[in-house]
């Protein structure tokens, strides 16, 4: 079993170290992670400059690029053999609902998914790493389950773990993505040099945290497991858009 491990918080992040330690013994682990924090990088690739690859003293490989860069470079240029699984995390904070569109953690797993490799993203829903060992224990259980009984391809799982002791977790729940309210307004401020700058505001609160969602499950103390897909086609609108676009198509 060959497992590629990445994240978006950087190769020095406690969440990555805890995940690698938890997965030890399950297979041959290769760690390729960003040199610096790339939270919110989504699926971006670096196309305007070359990437450098270095190895840390603990054997972790780090890249001066995004999470997607890391997995892409690993799969197409670093690893001698294709991995059986790609895992990402453990993220410092939740990746639920709309977060998944922006998440570098989910993006690293998505890159593996795009290459046809089963992929899992792990996030601890509160920042600060308070119960990171418990989160890593839960992550290992999910990976063990995938190894023991692999899901049929394609596989992209988004796993959010409550910030509590493992003994206080209430099991696992298969969920759908919830939804957040729009983000808070940007924060405008002025630098000491008189330049106006803007900070992106905090994420919005949960708008859909009803039973069955990732928000609801984690609030109940459950580990949320959400299967994702990357087909962005709105299939239910295809016929409506065909009718709407008919005059355009005729005149084309």
Swiss-Prot record:
One of its GO terms (molecular function) is exopolyphosphatase activity. It is found in: Cytoplasm. It comes from the Bacteria. Keywords: Cytoplasm, Hydrolase, Metal-binding, Nucleotide-binding. Its EC number is 3.1.3.5. One of its GO terms (cellular component) is cytoplasm. It catalyses: a ribonucleoside 5'-phosphate + H2O = a ribonucleoside + phosphate. A divalent metal cation binds at residues 8-9, 39, 91. Binds 1 divalent metal cation per subunit. Nucleotidase that shows phosphatase activity on nucleoside 5'-monophosphates. Belongs to the SurE nucleotidase family. This is 5'-nucleotidase SurE. It comes from Bordetella parapertussis (strain 12822 / ATCC BAA-587 / NCTC 13253).
């Amino acid at each position: 079993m060959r497992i590629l491990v990445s994240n978006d918080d950087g190769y020095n992040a406690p969440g990555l170290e805890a995940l690698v330690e938890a997965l030890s013994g399950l297979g041959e682990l290769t760690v390729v992670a960003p040199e610096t924090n790339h939270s919110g990088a989504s699926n971006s690739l670096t196309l305007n400059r070359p990437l450098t690859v270095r190895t840390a003293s603990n054997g972790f490989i780090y890249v001066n690029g995004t999470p997607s860069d890391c997995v892409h470079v690993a799969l197409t240029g670093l690893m001698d053999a294709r991995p059986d699984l790609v895992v990402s995390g453990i993220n410092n904070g939740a990746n639920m609902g709309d977060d998944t569109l922006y998440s570098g953690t989910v993006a690293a797993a998505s890159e593996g998914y795009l290459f046809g490799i089963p992929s899992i993203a792990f996030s601890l829903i509160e920042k600060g790493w308070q119960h990171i060992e418990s989160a890593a224990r839960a992550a290992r259980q999910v990976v063990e389950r995938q190894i023991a009984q692999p899901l049929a391809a394609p596989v992209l799982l988004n796993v959010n773990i409550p910030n509590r002791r493992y003994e206080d977790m209430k099991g696992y729940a298969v969920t759908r993505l919830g939804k957040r309210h729009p983000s808070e307004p940007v924060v405008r401020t002025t630098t000491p040099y008189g330049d106006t700058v803007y900070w992106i505001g905090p994420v919005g609160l949960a708008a859909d945290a009803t039973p069955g969602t990732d928000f609801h499950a984690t609030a109940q103390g459950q580990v949320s497991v959400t299967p994702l897909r990357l087909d962005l086609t709105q299939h239910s609108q295809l016929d409506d858009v065909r009718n709407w676009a008919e005059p355009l198509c005729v005149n084309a």
